[in-house]
Amino acid sequence: MDEVVVLAVAFFGAALLYASVGHAGASGYLAAMGLLGVAPATMKPTALALNILVASIVTVRFGLAGHVRWRALLPFLVGSIPMAFVGGALVLPGALYRPLVGIVLFIAAVRLFQTARAAGAAEGRETAIPAIPAVIAGAGIGLLSGLTGTGGGIFLTPLILSAGWAPARVAAGISAAFILANSIAGLLGNVASIGSFPAALPVWLIAVAIGGSLGAELGARRLGTPALRRALALVLVVAGLKLVFLG
């Protein structure tokens, strides 16, 4: 099967599944491209472009459902946007980029397992988000997002849930808007990478738009199940192993 079609199907599935838990799918897109040996120069801008579209869809859907708390989001963005821009401007050689993305995928897999356990527990408690820790956390996540081509939601959601700062759907809504801002900042940080967009990008954008719309509709009503998150984590582990050890 043609690589463009294979990736379109993979991206559709990633967008559907990730949008159902309030994310945009960057780690899934990177995993698919990594498994098929796509060049790092193409992986990063492609993942960010797909992320921007899906995160926009998810943010609107979760926002309309009342799950995005903009004031709670603000301190995270104060730290993350400039650092995502800086990270996006840094172009790592393939020998460093692939292992780094592989490690990020491993961490993302662990976080997915954690959210599978934490989502239910977090519903019963909620505390105010402290501004300074939120800015610091946002800065660290933003830099990593810009460097790798992810949106950072896979790190922010578990943090919010484990700290008891918001219930699961609100955590997902905050993360969706956070992902959107970081993805835009990361892509703007390396405008030159826009020239590395593959010719198949319009096809993939259509695929993720459909998948993301279906997933966002599902997620705004019923978040992805723990079993689904564990399955996604397994895929990320396989892709991470490939990137770290095989390049």
Task: List the predicted regions and their residue ranges.
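Juxtamembrane transmembrane-helix boundary motif
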Residues: 1-15, 19, 24, 28-36, ...
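Membrane-helix boundary/interface segments in integral membrane proteins
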Residues: 186-192
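Transmembrane alpha-helices of multi-pass small-molecule transport proteins
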Residues: 46-61
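Interfacial helix-capping/hinge residues at the ends of transmembrane alpha-helices
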Residues: 30, 156-157
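Short hydrophobic/aromatic, small-residue-rich stretches within specific transmembrane helices
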Residues: 47-51, 175-179, 201-205
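Hydrophobic alpha-helical transmembrane segments of multi-pass integral membrane proteins
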Residues: 170-186
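Small-residue hotspots at the loop-to-helix junctions and early N-terminal turns
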Residues: 40-45, 172-176
